[in-house]
């Protein structure tokens, strides 16, 4: 009736996502997955920012989102230590914080949603030890230094390799980007680097490496290549024999949006949520859908 408020109207909320970068296809897919899932909740307005791979800019964006009055912050921190202070401050203001994929130091957040990077890295190492017969030179394509997935994908891999003196590892930083990987690999190959296998901490970097190999007249299928994420490009490469295996690495966008809705509704949520990862080979590539 006129003048009488709707006592049953849902409370409206503003959720902000401070993303590290949208130049990376996996990170863009993560934001879009969150956006699509929030469409199920008409009382939630969703906004996001592009940190352009700049830690200081991501910090600034978090501050701007808080100033805009977000009811919940979602963030995938570019660097663990550098983002800890600002994220903890937001959490201490009683603004819920959902971390997607990447963590921080301490427990200044509401929930952390991610696959198990340590387990993935150990499985990748064990696979390469088997195919290389415990000896050889591995090129390790490293993601963003300082990000928790990079730290875990590096440390757990090298821990498995450490007891094997006939294994050597050369790391190069590709920042999870094709272009950065191509530049770094071209530079190494110009210096005469030879290697027996590639451990790529993302399938985007594996794709960049394959482009360089082909340019040099090297068949990617002649070298064991391990990737992580299992994007459509990796699925096709595995089918074609140009990549050995990959591990699915879901973005957690859907789970993040649903957890955010639960938090805003006053529900208790776990401090940590581990997402499943599947090892994909030529045998099951047709049965496992790529993450995007």
Residue ranges and their predicted role:
Residues 1-13, 141, 145, 149, ...:
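Hinge/cleft segment of the Venus flytrap/periplasmic-binding protein
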Residues 196-197, 203, 207-274, 281-285:
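Exported/periplasmic ABC-transporter solute-binding proteins
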């Amino acid at each position: 009736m006129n003048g009488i408020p709707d006592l049953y109207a849902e409370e409206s909320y503003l959720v902000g996502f401070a993303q590290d970068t949208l130049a990376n296809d996996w990170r863009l897919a993560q934001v879009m997955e969150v956006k699509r899932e929030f469409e199920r909740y008409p009382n939630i307005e969703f906004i996001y920012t592009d940190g352009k791979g700049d830690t200081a800019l991501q910090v600034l964006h978090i501050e701007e989102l808080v100033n805009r009055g977000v009811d919940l912050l979602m963030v995938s921190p570019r660097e663990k230590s550098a983002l800890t202070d600002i994220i903890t401050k937001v959490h201490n203001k009683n603004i819920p914080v959902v971390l997607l994929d990447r963590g921080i130091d301490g427990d200044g957040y509401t929930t952390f949603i991610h696959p198990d990077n340590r387990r993935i890295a150990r499985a990748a190492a064990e696979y390469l030890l088997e195919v290389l017969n415990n000896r050889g030179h591995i090129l390790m394509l490293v993601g963003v230094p300082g990000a928790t997935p990079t730290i875990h994908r590096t440390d757990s891999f090298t821990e498995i390799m450490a007891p094997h003196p006939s294994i050597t590892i050369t790391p190069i930083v590709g920042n999870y980007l094709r272009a950065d990987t191509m530049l770094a690999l071209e530079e190494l190959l110009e210096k005469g680097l030879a290697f027996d296998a590639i451990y790529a901490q993302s399938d985007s970097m594996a794709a960049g490496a394959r482009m360089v190999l082909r340019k040099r007249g090297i068949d990617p299928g002649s070298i064991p290549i391990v990737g992580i994420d299992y994007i459509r490009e990796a699925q096709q490469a595995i089918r074609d024999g140009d990549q050995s295996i990959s591990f699915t690495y879901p973005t957690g966008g859907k789970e993040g949006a649903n957890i955010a809705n639960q938090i805003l509704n006053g529900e208790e949520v776990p401090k940590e949520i581990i997402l499943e990862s599947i090892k994909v080979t030529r045998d099951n590539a047709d049965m496992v859908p790529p993450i995007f």
